[in-house]
Design a protein with these regions (language model features):
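Family-specific signature for flavin-dependent thymidylate synthase
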Residues: 2-293
């Protein structure tokens, strides 16, 4: 059965063997007053419960790049992503939260290190836990296996630990215009975006955000049409999507996942809820805050 990614992302839950693995908690539509932009709040707290959950979480996030539902749960995609960046995993692995307990003997092998990627990209919770991510765990193991008495990549979290993760680790899916996206990614959190390098507008049509001040401007309307016409003309002439996409104006929409640790989320709200923030990115923060209430 063929299913579009838009339909896939509108599913409220991702199942494995009849159990809910990843769940969309709630959503805020029409954040930019054009019936296109949105923010969704997702639950990835069980992503590190077992290996199957890891694969589903990672391929769920990575599939946004390719807009291909077949990517979901694909072990071949997972294995490719594991060695995507100079033999180390892609950023989609950052969407698997890992909770390390200072009272757990196995976890202590990682936590006792003066320096580690787990610590660098993690946050201390309640003076007992380190909330980090699976990509950092893999980096630490691959960089120096001799430091550990076992394969730390096999560390999974318990159901009780997943409840703690759910309280602190927040994942959102955004649909915003390019300038808003550019402001968002200045925040050093985990991001994964739709890639127009791989996905042509023949498969996923372009959508455009036209602000209130530009809606009645005929030249803006003409620019949108001209850019789309040129894009498709380039494709017909053999130009690849990764080159043809350069003619699309900044008002184009994109989709992007974001995963926030507690301090990262606080910083995002501090800067983007401020009255001096640009209206569009402020709407993302307002929507996120409402979804978390």
């Amino acid at each position: 059965m063929n299913i579009s990614l838009e339909i896939l992302y509108n599913l409220s839950s991702i199942f494995y063997k009849g159990k809910i693995v990843i769940k969309k908690i709630n959503e805020k539509q029409n954040i930019l007053n054009d019936n296109i932009g949105f923010v969704e709040n997702w639950d990835f707290s069980k992503a590190n419960l077992n290996e199957e959950n890891r694969i589903l979480a990672i391929t769920q996030v990575a599939s946004i790049c390719y807009q291909n539902p077949k990517a979901l749960g694909s072990e071949s995609l997972y294995n490719r992503l594991m060695a995507e960046s100079m033999g180390l995993p892609s950023s989609s692995f950052e969407f698997v939260p890992v909770l390390l307990d200072y009272e757990n003997p196995k976890h202590q092998e990682i936590l006792k290190l003066e320096y580690s990627n787990c610590k660098k990209f993690g946050e201390i919770l309640d003076d007992r836990y380190l909330l980090t991510n699976y990509r950092a765990l893999v980096y630490d193991f691959e960089n120096d296996k001799d430091k550990f008495s076992f394969d730390i990549r096999t560390i999974f979290n318990t159901q009780e630990e997943c409840k703690i993760i759910k309280e602190y680790f927040k994942v959102f899916l955004f649909k915003v215009d390019f300038p808003t996206r550019s402001q968002m990614v200045r925040h050093r959190i985990s991001w994964q975006e739709l890639s127009r390098r791989y996905v042509s507008a023949k498969r996923v049509p372009f959508e455009f955000y036209v602000s209130d001040k530009l809606k009645e401007n005929q030249k803006v309307k003409d620019l949108i049409k001209q850019s789309e016409d040129l894009y498709f003309e380039l494709l017909e002439n053999g130009v690849k999507p990764q080159e043809a996409r350069r003619v699309i104006p900044q008002m184009g929409y994109t989709q992007i996942w974001g995963a926030f640790m507690p301090k990262q989320l606080d910083n995002y709200f501090k800067l983007r809820l401020d009255e001096h923030a640009q209206w569009e990115i402020r709407q993302t923060a307002i929507a996120m805050q409402e979804l978390l209430r």
